[in-house]
Amino acid sequence: MKDEHNQEHDHLSPKEPESYQKAYACKEQQGEEKQEASEKEGEIKEDFELKYQEMREQYLRVHADFENVKKRLERDKSMALEYAYEKIALDLLPVIDALLGAHKSAVEVDKESALTKGLELTMEKLHEVLARHGIEGIECLEEFDPNFHNAIMQVKSEEKENGKIVQVLQQGYKYKGRVLRPAMVSIAKND
């Protein structure tokens, strides 16, 4: 058996064992290269994971910013509509005052005239429409409230106590609870 093994290697040149060494060295080098490639692959994977996480976080931030902007625009749009109604209401107040003045004059001339009745119906309809949109007159009962009333003058009154509303000089209005225009009133001062 030993002879067979020697016979197999007899035809090899003396340089061939050197080629085995080169092949072995080459194989070793390939192993090192594979290890380096594996390490590089690991580094690339790590780098990819980091970049992926950064991009994901950036996406989430941008998405959150977008949602916040969207909500703010919706709120701003809603507020703009609210203020548009308020502006229209403010522009209508002089018209309402004119109708009230016309009605007051018509009542003084003839309470039962068609003009007086027409003005009353017009005022009713106007107040219904305004109420439907959140615009209503300010109550001017007995108590003076500086949040809703503006005292223009003080007058003596036998029927009213000090500080009570005697007369409404100009109707006040509010829009959804906010004062558009305070009611102008006179209050009692009996001292």
UniProtKB/Swiss-Prot annotation:
<dbReference type="GO" id="GO:0005829">
    <property type="term" value="C:cytosol"/>
</dbReference>
<comment type="function">
    <text>Participates actively in the response to hyperosmotic and heat shock by preventing the aggregation of stress-denatured proteins, in association with DnaK and GrpE. It is the nucleotide exchange factor for DnaK and may function as a thermosensor. Unfolded proteins bind initially to DnaJ; upon interaction with the DnaJ-bound protein, DnaK hydrolyzes its bound ATP, resulting in the formation of a stable complex. GrpE releases ADP from DnaK; ATP binding to DnaK triggers the release of the substrate protein, thus completing the reaction cycle.</text>
</comment>
<dbReference type="GO" id="GO:0000774">
    <property type="term" value="F:adenyl-nucleotide exchange factor activity"/>
</dbReference>
<comment type="subunit">
    <text>Homodimer.</text>
</comment>
<dbReference type="Pfam" id="PF01025">
    <property type="entry name" value="GrpE"/>
</dbReference>
<protein>
    <recommendedName>
        <fullName>Protein GrpE</fullName>
    </recommendedName>
</protein>
<dbReference type="GO" id="GO:0042803">
    <property type="term" value="F:protein homodimerization activity"/>
</dbReference>
<comment type="similarity">
    <text>Belongs to the GrpE family.</text>
</comment>
<keyword id="KW-0346">Stress response</keyword>
<dbReference type="GO" id="GO:0051087">
    <property type="term" value="F:protein-folding chaperone binding"/>
</dbReference>
<feature type="compositionally biased region" description="Basic and acidic residues">
    <location>
        <begin position="29"/>
        <end position="45"/>
    </location>
</feature>
<dbReference type="GO" id="GO:0051082">
    <property type="term" value="F:unfolded protein binding"/>
</dbReference>
<keyword id="KW-0963">Cytoplasm</keyword>
<feature type="region of interest" description="Disordered">
    <location>
        <begin position="1"/>
        <end position="45"/>
    </location>
</feature>
<keyword id="KW-0143">Chaperone</keyword>
<dbReference type="InterPro" id="IPR009012">
    <property type="entry name" value="GrpE_head"/>
</dbReference>
<dbReference type="InterPro" id="IPR013805">
    <property type="entry name" value="GrpE_coiled_coil"/>
</dbReference>
<dbReference type="GO" id="GO:0006457">
    <property type="term" value="P:protein folding"/>
</dbReference>
<dbReference type="InterPro" id="IPR000740">
    <property type="entry name" value="GrpE"/>
</dbReference>
<feature type="compositionally biased region" description="Basic and acidic residues">
    <location>
        <begin position="1"/>
        <end position="19"/>
    </location>
</feature>
